[in-house]
Design a protein with these regions (language model features):
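Conserved glycine-rich cofactor-binding loop
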Residues: 12-13
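C-terminal helical subdomain
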Residues: 174-181, 190-229
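Catalytic Tyr-X3-Lys loop
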Residues: 101-120, 161
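Amphipathic alpha-helical dimer-interface segment in Rossmann-like NAD(P)H-dependent oxidoreductases
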Residues: 72, 76, 112-134, 170
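The beta1-alpha1 cofactor-binding region of Rossmann-like NAD(H)/NADP(H)-dependent oxidoreductases
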Residues: 38, 57-72
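Conserved mid-core segment of classical short-chain dehydrogenase/reductases
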Residues: 91-109, 150
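Catalytic loop of short-chain dehydrogenase/reductase
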Residues: 135-160, 165-170
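Conserved glycine-rich Rossmann-like NAD(P)H-binding loop of the short-chain dehydrogenase/reductase
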Residues: 26-42
Length: 229
């Protein structure tokens, strides 16, 4: 995978960090994006010594100019981008205990700016630099499709992100899809599967999933397990 370039937003922890490690371990050049410079430095140290090259880049997906420079940097290093994982996300509140009517306007705005507009910005700014066979993956969860009490505007923002994937799938030549790994233990959830256990799922979707099955659809754990059993 020496000639394979991956851009992961929200790469400093959780799913993003595990996905970055998986691809770097196989020799890909992984460009890791995050807002926290200290966390990026820790990530670089953690991934140092793996087979692939790792580049860390501070960027905020809420800022299209940051993301534009991120994609320019990734492409300048290796020529083009083979995989984009639009993983950056936030949750303001306690999962399962965030009623819509009790959320602040600030939380509403930031959920949408980060979790939905951030996906839009990441895809749009990556397009000029994508390799012909490049893929775009957007992590999500069932809360985006099966609204449950207590997930507030976070659920709304993830539903919006999935709608964006459907829209892009209708217009782009590149395979783009939603990856739903189930409940994963992250800073957002605090409980669930180890991110390292689901990172191979992202690798499979990126490299082995038939492109016709990555046309705006949701690829969940069941699909992955059936395909790899």
């Amino acid at each position: 995978m020496k000639e394979y370039t991956v851009v992961v937003t929200g790469a400093t922890r959780g799913i993003g960090g595990a996905v970055a490690r998986t691809f770097a371990a196989e020799g890909a050049h992984v460009v890791c994006c995050g807002r926290d410079a200290d966390a990026l430095a820790e990530l670089a140290t953690d991934l140092d010594g793996l087979e692939g090259d790792v580049t860390t880049h501070r960027a905020d997906v809420r800022d299209e100019f940051d993301v534009e420079f991120l994609m320019e940097t990734a492409a300048r290093i290796t020529g083009d981008i083979d995989l984009v994982v639009a993983n950056a996300g936030v949750y303001h509140g306690d999962p399962g205990h965030t009623p819509l009517a009790e959320e602040s306007y600030a939380a509403f705005d930031d959920h949408l700016r980060t979790n939905a507009r951030g996906v839009f910005t990441t895809v749009v700014e990556a397009l000029p630099y994508l390799a012909p066979e490049a893929r775009i993956l957007v992590p999500s969860g069932s809360v985006a499709r099966e609204f449950k009490p207590g997930y507030g505007t976070y659920a709304i923002s993830k539903s919006t992100a999935e709608a964006l994937v459907h829209g892009f799938a209708a217009e782009l030549d590149h395979p783009i899809g939603i990856v739903d790994p189930g409940v994963v233990e992250t800073d957002l959830t605090g409980t669930g599967r180890d991110p390292a256990d689901v990172a191979p799922m992202f690798r499979w979707v990126a490299l082995e999933c038939p492109p016709e099955d990555l046309n705006g659809q949701v690829v969940d754990l069941t699909v992955w397990k059936q395909a790899t059993r």
